[in-house]
């Protein structure tokens, strides 16, 4: 039987309707946590909730469009109201629009900036009050290897992920004395629906061909990395975790 290392801990996972978020919600539940799940697609959340219930997660389903900063803050308040507190916030919601700068759709890029960065900041801000007051809490921000290496056609996406990495480090230095831990996770290529967002046909075809040429990470691989971070003893903080497929160079 899996050790319940997160028994009596309360977690909120955004972008939980698929991919890394879905796998993370299940991993946290298997480790004993109570789990709130947030995303736009209610049907997917309801399906996930049915799988979480047998694990004892007592799931709270939060349908929300996190492009709205008030919704990003409200899901935190709703989690705290429902369970009494929030111990672990996993900011996973995001999109990936890849295209050359000269052909960029700035409206699409603005949406990506708002979801990948500003929404994450809004949820984090909402969670800090309770965590600092209790001197206990963990913020996990999902960035990307694109937050370390900026490649052609990924200018805006990389900018958002570099932003998440920088925000996470600055936040860590603001809250470490309150015993609030901050971890930023930087996955390489993962087999998720994220590439479906790419609107530039040639770039999308190239990325998909590249993905087929190697053994991609699975969402469960990233969820396991997140679980590792949030199950360390209180005196240990994993500030940054970079993971790539073995076959991925850049």
Feature map (PLM): residue ranges:
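Residue(s) in the substrate-gating loop at a strand-loop-helix junction
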Residues: 144
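The beta1-alpha1 cofactor-binding region of Rossmann-like NAD(H)/NADP(H)-dependent oxidoreductases
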Residues: 43, 63-74, 106
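Conserved glycine-rich cofactor-binding loop
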Residues: 10, 17-18
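Conserved glycine-rich Rossmann-like NAD(P)H-binding loop of the short-chain dehydrogenase/reductase
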Residues: 33-48
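Active-site helix of classical SDR
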Residues: 124, 160
